[in-house]
C-alpha cells in the first residue's frame, strides 16, 4: 500500500469516527457524494499539515539526541534554535573538598575527606580523641578535621603530636619519654643524697654512704657538720642548724628525733618527746610518757607516769576509759544526774543534758545552763550577741543581731544565713573576689593585691600588702628600719640595719622573734587551734554522723573520735605564705578510710586538702555518682559549684577529678595506704603569691612521700585545719605553723622546666 492509499484510509477512519462517513440510503447520490469528497479532501489537507509538523518535531528530537554526550548537551544545530546545558555537578552538590563526577545516572560524590565520615554529600567530623591517641594524663583536643595532643606532662618529654582520621589516631600514639631527673640534674635533692628516678618524677632518698643528715638539713660528710652560713655546727649529729632572723644559730632535732638540738634521742611517735630521757634539762628532753601514741601535751591526769593517751584508766579511779563517764576525773561512783554522757564529777551542767559540754566563756558552767553564755554581764535573753561579748550592744542595721556577731552588720538579715561558711552572710555576700585571696572586694583591705591575712599594722583601713607606710610613721617602708613599729627617728644604736624600736621583736607583739611563729604579724604569735570553726561537708541525710573534735595541748593537738561524715576543723587565722607541719596517727585498727589536713581554706567550697586513704573502696552511697577511693596520699584543689552536700561528698571520696567539684593535683605514685597505729610527720610549704605547693611525709626519720613542686593558684591564701572522712580515732599532734613568704629555691627551676 502506497503513501496516498494510507492517507486515504486514515482519512476515512477519521470520518467514520466523527460520523461524517455515513451515506443515507436512497435519494440523489451525485450531489451528496461530491459534497462528501470535498469534505474528505479538506480533512486530508488538515491531516497532511499535522503529519508535516510531527515529522519536523521528530527530526529535531533526533538531531538533539545524536548530539548529546557525557559532558552535557551541545548546542542544537537546528537553524534558529539553541539549548543551554544543565550541569549535574552543581555547586554544593558534594561536601567541600569532595570530588564530584557526572555519570549517566547523575552526579556522584567521592569519599569524605580524611577526618570525616559520611556519604560524600554530607560529612561529619570524626572525634579522633575517642581512640585515645594522647599520652596518659595529656589532654586530647579534637579539631575539624583531626586532633592534637597537649604537651607531655611534667617529668616527660616528647614532640608535639597531631593527626587526622581514626586510622591514624589508632595506629599513631603520642610518645612521651620519662625524664631521668637524677641524670639531667633537674631534681632538687640535697647534695650527697640518693636520687631515685620514678616514672614522671623522682624521689629523694637518704644521704649517701659516708654522709649524715636528711633532705631538710642537708647531707654532710660524717663527722662534719656545718650551719647554712658555712660555720661549724654545734648541733647533735641528728639535728639541723638553723639561722635565726637576728643571725644567731639554733639547733632543731631532725624528724624521728627529739631533744634540745644539742642532744637528740629517738622519737618513735613523732610527738616531740624522746623515747628515753636525755641528759638535758629542757622539757623536750623528758622521757615520752606514751612512746607509741603521739601526745604532744604529755597530759597525765593521775600522774602515774603513763600519759592519758595510752593509759587504759587515765584518771586512776578503777573504771576503764571506755566505761568511764568521766575518763579524766576520778568518779568511781559514776553518778550521772541528768543521764547525758557525762558524770556529775565532770559535767558542766549537772542537771541539764549537754553532751557537747560547750562552755563559750570558760567559766566552768556549760552554755546549756549558763544564763550569760559569753560572760559580758548581759543575760542571754537580752543579749543581741549571746555568744560574743559586746557590752555596748550596738546594732547598726537594727535586725536584732549585734554588730559584734552580725555577718552583715550594715544589712538587715536576722536569719544570719551563710551557706558557704565564710563569715559573710548571704544577704551581703557578693562572691566578687578579683585577687582570689578569699575576701570579697567590698571587705578586702587590698582588693587587687592577694593578702589573705588582711594584716593592717597601723589600722588605717589599708592592708600592709598595699600600704607603702605600714606603721604610718612618715617613713616609707622601703627605707623604714622598723616597718611595723612607728619610729620616725629611725634610731639604730648598733647600726645593724634594724631599728632599736623593733630589735629582737620585729612586730612588737611582746613575743621575741625566735619563738614567734609570725614575727612580722603582731596578731599571730603561737600555734593555736583552741578556737576553731567546724564545717560539715555533707550536712543532709543520715549516711553517718558529724565529727567530734577534741583539742589538747593548748591548741597544738586535735583528736577526732567518731566514724563520721566528711568534716573540717578550721582555725580562724588566715595566712599568706605558710609552713604547716604536724604528726598524723590513726590510733585504731578497725577502719581504713580518709584523714588529712587542709590549707588555703576560703569557704566551704574553696580549699586545698591533703588526704590519705588506707585501702581501695567504693563509696557505699552510689548517688549522685559512683565514687572510688584508691589507697595513698592525694593533694586536691576543691572548687565546688554546689558546696557541702552529696556532690562534694562523693567528689572528695573519689580519687581523680570531678567536674565542677574537685581537681586532683598530685597523688603518691606508690599507692600505699597509712598503717594502723603508726605516726607520720608532714611538712607543707604553700606560697600562694606564686602558686607554690610542696608536701612531704616522713615515717620515722625516713622520707616516704614527696609531691615535689606543684603549682596551682586556685586559692591565693587562706586558713588551716584538719580533715576527716569516715575515719575514727585520728590524732593530729605537735601541730606547728609559721608565716613564711620566702620563695623556695626549687620554685624557679621547676617553673622553667614547665615552660
Swiss-Prot record:
Glycan attachment positions: 119, 740
InterPro entries in the record: ConA-like_dom_sf, EGF-like_Ca-bd_dom, EGF-like_dom, EGF_Ca-bd_CS, Growth_fac_rcpt_cys_sf, NOTCH1_EGF-like, Thrombospondin_3-like_rpt, Thrombospondin_3_rpt
Composition bias type Basic and acidic residues, residue spans: 332-341, 353-368, 412-424, 456-465
The EGF-like domain, residue ranges: 85-124, 125-177, 178-220, 223-265
UniProtKB keywords: Apoptosis, Calcium, Cell adhesion, Disulfide bond, EGF-like domain, Extracellular matrix, Glycoprotein, Heparin-binding, Phosphoprotein, Repeat, Secreted, Signal
PROSITE patterns linked to this entry: EF_HAND_1 (PS00018), EGF_2 (PS01186), EGF_3 (PS50026), EGF_CA (PS01187), TSP3 (PS51234), TSP_CTER (PS51236)
Cofactor: Ca(2+)
Gene Ontology CC entries for this record: extracellular matrix; extracellular region; extracellular space; protein-containing complex
TSP C-terminal domain: residues covered: 530-744
CDD domains xrefs: EGF_CA, TSP-5cc
Pfam families: COMP, EGF_CA, TSP_3, TSP_C
Residue numbers spanned by region COMP N-terminal: 21-84
Ranges where the record places region Mediates cell survival and induction of the IAP family of survival proteins: 525-755
Chief subcellular location: secreted
Disulfide partners: 89-100, 94-109, 112-123, 129-140, 134-149, 152-176, 182-195, 189-204, 207-219, 227-241, 235-251, 253-264, 280-285, 290-310, 326-346, 349-369, 385-405, 408-428, 446-466, 482-502, 518-739
UniProt-annotated stretches for the region Disordered: 296-341, 353-501
Its job: Plays a role in the structural integrity of cartilage via its interaction with other extracellular matrix proteins such as the collagens and fibronectin. Can mediate the interaction of chondrocytes with the cartilage extracellular matrix through interaction with cell surface integrin receptors. Could play a role in the pathogenesis of osteoarthritis. Potent suppressor of apoptosis in both primary chondrocytes and transformed cells. Suppresses apoptosis by blocking the activation of caspase-3 and by inducing the IAP family of survival proteins (BIRC3, BIRC2, BIRC5 and XIAP).
Domain notes: The cell attachment motif mediates the attachment to chondrocytes. It mediates the induction of both the IAP family of survival proteins and the antiapoptotic response.
Family according to the record: Belongs to the thrombospondin family.
Record PANTHER family: CARTILAGE OLIGOMERIC MATRIX PROTEIN, THROMBOSPONDIN
Quaternary structure and interacting proteins, as annotated: Pentamer; disulfide-linked. Exists in a more compact conformation in the presence of calcium and shows a more extended conformation in the absence of calcium. Interacts with ITGB3, ITGA5 and FN1. Binding to FN1 requires the presence of divalent cations (Ca(2+), Mg(2+) or Mn(2+)). The greatest amount of binding is seen in the presence of Mn(2+). Interacts with MATN1, MATN3, MATN4 and ACAN. Binds heparin, heparan sulfate and chondroitin sulfate. EDTA dimishes significantly its binding to ACAN and abolishes its binding to MATN3, MATN4 and chondroitin sulfate.
Name by which UniProt lists this protein: Cartilage oligomeric matrix protein
Name of the gene: Comp
